[in-house]
Amino acid sequence: MEEADFVQKDPTGRYIRYNDVLGRGAFKTVYKAFDEVEGIEVAWNLMSIEDVLQMPGQLDRLYSEVHLLNSLKHDNIIKLFYSWVDDHNKSINMITELFTSGSLTLYRKKHRKVDPKAIMNWARQILKGLHYLHSQTPPVIHRDLKCDNIFVNGNTGKVKIGDLGLAAVMQQPTARSVIGTPEFMAPELYEEEYNELVDIYSFGMCMLEMVTCEYPYRECRNQAQIYKKVTSGIKPQSLSKVDDPQVKQFIEKCLLPAPSRPTALELLKDQLLAVDGAKDSTLTASSNTTFKPAMPPQCEYRPMDVEYKKNTSVSICSSAKSSQECALLQTMEVQRVAESTEFKLSGERRDDVAASMALRIAGSSGQARKVDFDFNLKTDTARAVTGEMVEELDLSSHEVTVIAEMIDELIMKLKANRSLPNANSVYQSKDEEAGESMKSEISADYYHRVSSNEGSRLGCCCEAVESLLSSFLDSCSMVSNKQSEDLKTELNVIESQYNQSCQRLLRMKEEAIEKAKRKWMKLS
């Protein structure tokens, strides 16, 4: 390929990009590129700023990945050579190592007959990378380790950990955000209280996939079923397909409960990974170090902290970002209380058709049920998705109704927030005032569906109605119980009719948009 074929140069003139696409992600396209100084091929990761901003949380994850890759240097961690923002083309660019053999998942599917020694070699390299991450001060947790995020050079057998966009720097003793890929997530991740040993659990699932060529929990139909099995300690069916008892025991060791789970260093010393009885010189320097996190008296905020507050959504934010930028990316949320049970549903829109949601149900006993799931905005319905959770979460018919209504409400909020990106900042203060002004019994009952930090509803008309109701309810604190009950009934009817009207309006809006798109597509 001649240099004349290149389509773009970086600001320094060192790297040139070709039009050869190596891969595509949700918001990232990877091209083949060339380093003219070193004379080597590299990967050019190109992300549209507009696409990134439209996907809540992705900007923070991208910042996290760039920040970490700049500071981490290890043979088994993917190298970042250069990164910059292109204001002219409205893009974010990263130059990284090139792995033409792709991910370990694809490589293993392509080469199904592999000697166990090769798999043990890959395992050693992954553990060395994890040992390096976990031995940082403070430790770095990958949180999304899977074979899809591990890359291989087929010519040398070198394996490297990549995709650190969800990694967390542990400034506090335990992290608290539920994030990752369900099939590879440790049980304690769902409890929102975990440390770097969650990566060891994920590594065990990677080992299982490498040995069996099968994705863990393939027998499950949805994420709710995976959640129930993981939190109940039920292992994937594919574990029974591991014939070698020593390999099976090694994998089971990785999947032990967190207090009994070994560290990366301890696994590297396992007899299964021994290289002809030789001692690995790369581990000698830190062989006497343990990495069980201690409990510091206080946590201080730093640029890469995992931000946590009770009853709020959690995200990784750069302290350099303005509050307005973070507000545009924050997760939408719906809360309800019914029959002494608290329901909390949060979600973010990943693209035009997909949304990711997290449901938490807390009973009066203090025990909580949690599940993460995806929602297709074009094909899924709230009732169908909730129906899939009945068996896994042991839901009552009343709970099914409440959750389905919450999903519908969250979808409307996500769609409205997509259409009106600044609505959150305009109306949040009004929501807070409304939440604080609930004095009467009627007000408390009516507003059980509104959270003070929910964000906007469906635009100006919704806020006007809620504002009027809030003012009216404040003036009704002295009415009789009979009048209160009658008024509550009437308000519930009004709310039901109002919500139905809002849903119809949203459907009409979507139909009009689609009609306009089709018209312009025909013209073009």
Curated annotation (Swiss-Prot):
PROSITE patterns: PROTEIN_KINASE_DOM, PROTEIN_KINASE_ST
InterPro entries hit by this protein: Kinase-like_dom_sf, Prot_kinase_dom, Ser/Thr_kinase_AS, WNK_Ser-Thr_kinase
Domain of life of the native organism: Eukaryota
Protein's UniProt keywords contain Transport: no
Kinase in keyword set: yes
Coiled-coil stretches: 480-523
Record-listed Phosphoserine modification sites: 477
E.C. no: 2.7.11.1
Domain Protein kinase: 16-273
Single GO MF annotation: protein serine kinase activity
This protein's name: Probable serine/threonine-protein kinase WNK10
Organism of this sequence: Arabidopsis thaliana
Record gene name: WNK10
